[in-house]
């Protein structure tokens, strides 16, 4: 797996999912050259979606993409049985792969993680993207565990690494041939320079073309050209994480008149000071 895969937001309208807005956002990304989308992930506010909404969003994403780009469906859970059910649903409706976050809150051991992902891998045939984000889950998927899973299961092909420690990421890349996608926009270029393959991105929701260009340059070894875009994007990327994701990206999309709508509690509107910083970054980039 290689390239740019925006983690799409879930637009809301009148308390429900705005499916027309969702389609509009996906088509915008397809038209701007992304390699695929990630549906109902962290950026899509998956924790506050009902199971029915979760499934309908995946179905809509598959329908809109229609084979033009890949759909990576969020299917993770801190319950192995629930993750299996969500993964099987995603496969049944035509998703190209599933994104599986490490179980959160219950803090499994590395052996528990091996057994969790093994059970899911044995239950489906489509590719699996492991998702390591210790800042949210309180558990780190160790390089040795990733290596074991990659070598044991042919459908575990990729890991989204949102651990910002480049030493950890280097160990992962050096341990096996699993595809590594950065889970941090700001670290995309460094991760590719270490041997990574791309990114699951937040900023690409609003500047997909530029981000795709940067990643393409990097994957072609044109790091001078990639660096120029990286630094052009840098302040904008940082501004999208001054509060919890997806609060800033949805705020930015609303400011840019893109379908986004409200946030679902417990997420709420940005503090005015931070919103001003975000608006400034959007203006400096030329989006406002």
UniProtKB/Swiss-Prot annotation:
Signal peptide: none annotated. It is found in: Cytoplasm. Pfam families: DHDPS. GO terms for cellular component: cytoplasm. It comes from the Archaea. The keyword Ubl conjugation does not apply. Pathway: Amino-acid biosynthesis; L-lysine biosynthesis via DAP pathway; (S)-tetrahydrodipicolinate from L-aspartate: step 3/4. GO terms for molecular function: 2-dehydro-3-deoxy-phosphogluconate aldolase activity; 4-hydroxy-tetrahydrodipicolinate synthase activity. Homotetramer; dimer of dimers. This is 4-hydroxy-tetrahydrodipicolinate synthase. It comes from Methanococcus aeolicus (strain ATCC BAA-1280 / DSM 17508 / OCM 812 / Nankai-3). The lineage of its organism: Archaea, Methanobacteriati, Methanobacteriota, Methanomada group, Methanococci. The gene is dapA.
């Amino acid at each position: 797996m290689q390239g740019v895969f925006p983690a799409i937001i879930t637009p809301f309208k009148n308390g429900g999912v705005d499916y027309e807005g969702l389609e509009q956002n996906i088509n915008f990304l397809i038209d701007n050259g992304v390699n695929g989308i990630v549906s109902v992930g962290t950026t899509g506010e998956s924790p506050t979606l009902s199971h029915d909404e979760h499934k309908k969003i995946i179905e809509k994403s598959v329908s809109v993409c229609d084979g033009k780009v890949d759909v990576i469906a969020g299917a993770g859970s801190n319950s192995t049985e629930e993750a299996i059910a969500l993964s099987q649903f995603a496969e049944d409706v035509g998703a190209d792969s599933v994104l599986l976050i490490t179980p959160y809150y219950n803090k499994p051991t590395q052996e528990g993680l091996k057994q969790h992902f093994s059970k899911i891998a044995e239950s489906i045939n489509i590719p699996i993207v492991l998702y390591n984000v210790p800042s949210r889950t309180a558990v780190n998927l160790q390089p040795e565990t990733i290596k074991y899973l990659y070598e044991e299961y042919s459908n575990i092909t990729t890991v989204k690494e949102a651990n910002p420690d480049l030493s950890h990421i280097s160990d992962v890349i050096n341990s096996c041939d699993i595809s590594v996608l950065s889970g941090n926009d700001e670290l995309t270029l460094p991760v590719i320079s270490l041997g990574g393959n791309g990114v699951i991105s937040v900023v690409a929701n609003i500047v997909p073309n530029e981000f795709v260009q940067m990643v393409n340059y990097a994957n072609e070894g044109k790091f001078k050209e990639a660096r120029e875009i990286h630094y052009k994007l840098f302040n904008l990327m940082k501004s999208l994480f001054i509060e919890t994701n997806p609060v800033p990206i949805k705020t930015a999309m609303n400011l840019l008149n893109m379908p986004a709508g409200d946030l679902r509690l417990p997420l709420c509107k940005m503090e005015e000071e931070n919103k001003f910083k975000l608006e400034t970054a959007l203006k400096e980039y030329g989006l406002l």
